[in-house]
């Protein structure tokens, strides 16, 4: 009985590893589209994956922001960066945060 419990647990854990966010996924691609086109983040920010070299805002490759930091900055604005709350949907903000946090971490 114990062996079957451990086998089932191992099976579940093994397959959960493959469900972690890995690019390209739909949210990642949506976030990249928001970054490049709708919010035009690359105008101000450098990000290697997006091939952008903006120099007004911080270089995202260097600061490697986590998803919460990106959501907060995009939603409320920070420094000279305007808030995008009301401009982007919650889903778009979460998608761009997902994209930036994964791309900058590489």
Residue ranges, per PLM feature:
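N-terminal export/targeting leaders of redox proteins
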Residues: 1-25, 106
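Functionally constrained cores in energy, signaling, and assembly domains
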Residues: 5, 16, 49-50, 96-97, ...
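Short linear sequence motifs
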Residues: 7-11, 28, 77, 92
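C-terminal capping alpha-helices of c-type cytochrome domains
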Residues: 87-106
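Gly/Gly-Pro-rich "capping" loops immediately C-terminal to redox-active cysteine motifs
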Residues: 28, 32-36, 42-78, 87
């Amino acid at each position: 009985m114990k062996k079957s419990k451990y086998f089932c647990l191992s099976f579940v854990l093994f397959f959960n590893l493959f469900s972690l966010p890995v690019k390209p996924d739909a949210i990642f691609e949506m976030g990249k589209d928001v970054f490049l086109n709708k919010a035009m983040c690359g105008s101000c920010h450098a990000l290697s994956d997006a091939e952008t070299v903006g120099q007004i805002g911080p270089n995202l490759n260097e600061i490697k922001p986590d998803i919460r930091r990106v959501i907060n900055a995009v939603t409320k604005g920070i420094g000279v960066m305007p808030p995008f709350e009301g401009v982007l949907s919650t889903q778009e903000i979460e998608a761009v945060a997902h994209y930036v946090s994964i791309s900058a971490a590489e």
